[in-house]
């Protein structure tokens, strides 16, 4: 199931996240200042601020990917229908009866508009605008130009289909090439966590036992490492999103994941707080 996220949804999501997060932060500073739980609630607030926008971005990205994956399939079916002798308008009406993921609803609207007498070019351009992806808009413009070509429209549509498929393949290849960089960001974060566990359990704790370090110094060191780890988790997540998906907002989910993992590791294996 695909869910389309509007600009209004994103504004409401950000407003709700920031509002709840700021409420947690204000309460934290007012009631937990100096408490062992002070840092915990800062992390909870940060996760809350990132969580809803991360979910909205994921749903939006899923919608866009679903549309762009199905556009070449739609064009290919339109090409085959025209080869079989169907006029372009009739081919679109038949395609509207099939399943093309998130494109299905918009395609049905386009078929209805054509049936109601709206010019073909206008209906197709409206389709591209409603879907809203760069690939959909390009495909819509190419379809309009092809419809004006006259004879052998199906040959032109075949060229368009191949062109659009190539554009989609290039985009997927770019994302695949950037995935290793996202992986490197995660590896760097996990290396930091591993080193922290080694330091605290093999060096700091024995040092306190044999009086080389005071217990206060050990606890302060753990808190410093915790804060460094949480800062790295948040910022590394944003970097992973920028490198892997080309958008900082795409890194919010990585930030949430790293913050959650980092918090659990520090509580369970480092013994902070």
Give the predicted meaning of each segment:
Residues 1-84, 97-102, 165-273:
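Hydrophobic alpha-helical signal-anchor/transmembrane segments
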């Amino acid at each position: 199931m695909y869910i389309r996220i509007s600009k209004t949804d994103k504004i409401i999501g950000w407003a709700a996240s920031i509002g709840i997060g700021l409420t947690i932060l204000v309460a934290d500073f007012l009631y937990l200042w100096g408490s062992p739980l002070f840092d915990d609630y800062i992390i909870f607030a940060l996760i809350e601020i990132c969580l809803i926008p991360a979910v909205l971005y994921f749903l939006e990205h899923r919608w866009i990917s679903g549309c762009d994956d199905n556009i070449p399939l739609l064009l290919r079916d339109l090409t085959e229908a025209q080869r079989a002798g169907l006029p372009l308008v009739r081919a679109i009406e038949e395609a509207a009866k099939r399943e093309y993921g998130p494109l299905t609803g918009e395609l049905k609207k386009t078929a209805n508009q054509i049936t109601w007498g709206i010019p073909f070019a206008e209906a197709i351009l409206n389709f591209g605008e409603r879907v809203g992806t760069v690939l959909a808009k390009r495909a819509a413009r190419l379809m309009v130009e092809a419809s004006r070509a006259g004879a052998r429209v199906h040959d032109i549509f075949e060229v368009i289909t191949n062109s659009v498929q190539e554009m989609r393949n290039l985009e997927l290849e770019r994302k695949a090439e950037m995935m290793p960089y996202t992986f490197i960001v995660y590896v760097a974060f996990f290396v930091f966590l591993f080193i922290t566990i080694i330091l605290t359990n093999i060096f700091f704790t024995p040092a306190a036992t044999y009086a080389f370090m005071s217990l206060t110094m050990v606890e302060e060191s753990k808190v410093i490492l915790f804060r460094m780890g949480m800062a790295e988790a948040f910022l590394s997540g944003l970097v992973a999103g920028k490198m892997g998906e080309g958008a900082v907002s795409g890194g919010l989910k990585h930030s949430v994941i790293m913050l959650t993992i980092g918090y659990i590791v520090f509580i369970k294996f480092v013994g902070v707080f």
